[in-house]
UniProtKB/Swiss-Prot annotation:
Changing D183N: No change in activity. This is Imidazole glycerol phosphate synthase subunit HisF. Keywords: Amino-acid biosynthesis, Cytoplasm, Histidine biosynthesis, Lyase. Changing D130E: Weak activity. The keyword Membrane does not apply. HAMAP family: HisF. Belongs to the HisA/HisF family. Disulfide bonds: none annotated. The keyword Ribonucleoprotein does not apply. It comes from Thermotoga maritima (strain ATCC 43589 / DSM 3109 / JCM 10099 / NBRC 100826 / MSB8). PANTHER family: IMIDAZOLE GLYCEROL PHOSPHATE SYNTHASE HISHF, IMIDAZOLE GLYCEROL PHOSPHATE SYNTHASE SUBUNIT HISF/H IGP SYNTHASE SUBUNIT HISF/H. It is found in: Cytoplasm.
Length: 253
């Protein structure tokens, strides 16, 4: 059985990590390379860099950053945010990103999923889906959760797999930032619809929440602030999960 993965998410703006971190032993906690290296050393299985820089002219900064990260880090890393076309996705992968995460662009141009998958393999394409409840149905939202697409979550999950996605990054807008636990109802809803790995996102606040996500059917759990502010220690989290019967990677811890 494949080990369940713990993923840290870093928001990057103009080549710097924002939203703050609380690591005293880092010279510069705003440096994505240093922070990424640190995370890889303490047992995080994968990293997601989310480029929240709005402007296209800053893309060069992200490309240079990806190159530096690829040189320094030996765990898989995904880059997302602002990827609207094949050229951008392609450049990021060629510079060293293991995977790219696409969200709004995938909804607006689903053939982009297929194009990236056919060129670089399905494992390089993560489709990020932001969903929330509307009148009792899970609906897909784009533009950072602002626009209701009118697409049912169940339909979109099936389509992204057909189109060649390798993974689904499932964020519950209702839970994001609440620290009240992952949306296990949403995870359970999506699980039977796809054979793709599901990364649960939104709501991590304590170790039990990770266990709940895995028991609900998630293959990986992503979190940000609980790691950045050391509210959860990665080693302790993995030991806790193992004790509760979850297969996690402990080598190097």
């Amino acid at each position: 059985m494949l080990a369940k993965r713990i993923i840290a998410c870093l928001d990057v703006k103009d080549g710097r990590v924002v939203k703050g971190t609380n690591f005293e032993n880092l010279r510069d906690s705003g440096d994505p390379v240093e922070l990424g290296k640190f995370y890889s050393e303490i047992g995080i299985d994968e990293l997601v860099f989310l480029d929240i820089t709005a402007s296209v002219e800053k893309r060069k900064t992200m490309l240079e950053l990806v190159e530096k990260v690829a040189e320094q880090i030996d765990i898989p890393f995904t880059v997302g945010g602002g990827i609207h076309d094949f050229e951008t996705a392609s450049e990021l992968i060629l510079r060293g990103a293991d995977k790219v995460s696409i969200n709004t662009a995938a909804v607006e141009n689903p053939s982009l999923i297929t194009q990236i998958a056919q060129t670089f393999g399905s494992q390089a394409v993560v489709v990020a889906i932001d969903a929330k409840r509307v009148d009792g149905e899970f609906m897909v939202f784009t533009y950072s959760g602002k626009k209701n697409t009118g697409i049912l979550l169940r339909d979109w999950v099936v389509e992204v797999e057909k189109r060649g996605a390798g993974e689904i990054l499932l964020t519950s807008i209702d839970r994001d930032g609440t620290k009240s636990g992952y949306d296990t109802e949403m995870i359970r809803f999506v699980r039977p619809l796809t054979t793709l790995p599901i990364i649960a996102s939104g709501g991590a606040g304590k170790m039990e929440h990770f266990l709940e996500a895995f028991l609900a059917g998630a293959d990986a759990a992503l979190a940000a602030s609980v790691f950045h502010f050391r509210e959860i220690d990665v080693r302790e989290l993995k030991e806790y999960l193992k004790k509760h019967g979850v297969n996690v990677r402990l080598e190097g811890l």
